[in-house]
A protein has these predicted regions:
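A broadly tuned "polar low-complexity/structure-edge" signature
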Residues: 1-21, 111-117, 157, 212, ...
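Intrinsic-disorder/low-complexity loop/linker signature
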Residues: 126, 193, 302-304
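Catalytic activation segment of kinase domains across protein kinase-like and atypical kinase folds
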Residues: 177, 183-233
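Regulatory N- and C-terminal appendages and interdomain linkers associated
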Residues: 1-66, 79-81, 91-97, 107, ...
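Hydrophobic transmembrane alpha-helix bundles
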Residues: 150-162, 214-227, 270-289
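Alpha-helical structural motif
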Residues: 140, 216-219, 223, 246-249, ...
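Proline- and acidic/polar-enriched loop/turn elements at helix boundaries
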Residues: 116-117, 183, 297
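Conserved ATP-binding subdomain of kinase catalytic cores across diverse folds
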Residues: 43-158, 162-179, 226-234
């Protein structure tokens, strides 16, 4: 079937393109025709009602999945056999977040998968609409509020914090400055008796070669403040067990982060007859989800000890 014969096609999609992400120096003028920037094409994307504000999309397109709190309009949309999360934001923010998520994915970090950025959206009357960032829905994941709405174990808050600490350390090791760490910007997956955390919002993030201690500490302090506020909000809604101390849980993130960061980056000193401790440390890191590909080992100046640090 020819493109111009497709039923239910947004007229502006007739001039649409599906391409690789453009260079950052490309023309920043708002396109007059719909433009879908994506790493791979999905023909079903062109049949969606891009001419409508996301909040007004037909219910038959939407997937009834729990959504977290967001500053923007967010909807889960059926696109063929896939379910995509769509967020309506400004073009500049959408394109930047898309690129950051792509880079984080290439580093094999736990984030949602970016699918596309849609710009050049207009109503039938020609009024401009905000861009839409499209990511793949993470199957079986839940936002933190949906987890607390269920009858879970009393230590759920602590387990979520532990998962967030692991995520934050992994991102920081890769040089990612988050800038807005919170439970709201994370999705959680059940992993046996624990949880795994995935980054879903990278609007304020920045990927650098290496973070300074000040950048890391800012992220940690902001995370603590946001988490305490989010848990207090849960408590006011009777969703948090009465014996949970919100401030104590917030402090737990700080403690867990520093403990994990130290385990990953500090140099241990062993006597030559204590080499079994190296395996013990590697096993501990593997249990936390960190693959230790290499160990840097050298003899101390006194010649009696071995210095070991993961690489």
């Amino acid at each position: 079937m020819e493109l111009n014969e497709l039923p239910q096609m947004d007229p502006r999609a007739l001039k649409a393109t599906s391409v690789k992400a453009e260079d950052e120096h490309a023309n920043s003028a708002e396109p007059q025709a719909l433009k879908i920037t994506a790493a791979s094409s999905n023909p079903k994307m062109f049949t969606l009602p891009w001419h409508k504000p996301l909040a007004t999309w037909p219910k038959d397109l939407l997937a009834n999945l729990p959504r977290g709190i967001s500053r923007h309009v967010v909807r889960f949309v059926h696109v063929g056999d896939e379910v995509y999360a769509m967020k309506e934001i400004t073009r500049q923010v959408a394109e930047r977040e898309y690129e950051i998520l792509r880079r984080l994915q290439k580093l094999e970090l736990p984030t949602v998968t970016p699918i596309a950025v849609v710009i050049g959206r207009h109503t039938r009357e020609g009024e401009p609409l905000e861009a839409i960032l499209v990511t793949r829905h993470l199957k079986f994941s839940l936002p933190y509020r949906a987890l607390f709405a269920r009858n879970l174990r009393p230590d759920t808050a602590e387990r979520l914090i532990d998962a967030l600490a692991v995520l934050l350390v992994r991102l920081h090791l890769a040089g990612f400055y988050w800038g807005d760490v919170s439970l709201s910007n994370v999705l959680f997956l059940r992993d046996a008796d624990a949880f795994s955390a995935f980054l879903v919002d990278a609007e304020t993030g920045d990927l650098q070669a290496q973070l300074t201690d000040g950048q890391r500490e800012y992220d940690i302090d902001l995370a603590r403040t946001n988490i305490i506020g989010e848990l207090m909000d849960l408590a006011s809604g009777k969703l948090l067990p009465g014996d949970v101390d919100e401030i104590e849980v917030g402090n737990r993130l700080v403690d867990r982060y520093h403990s994990l960061w130290s385990t990953l980056t500090d140099t241990d000193k062993f006597n030559p007859d204590e080499m079994w401790k190296i395996e013990q440390r590697v096993n501990k890191l593997n249990e936390l989800g960190f693959d230790v590909d290499e160990l840097e080992m050298k003899t101390a100046e006194d010649g009696k000890r071995v210095l070991v640090r993961p690489r």
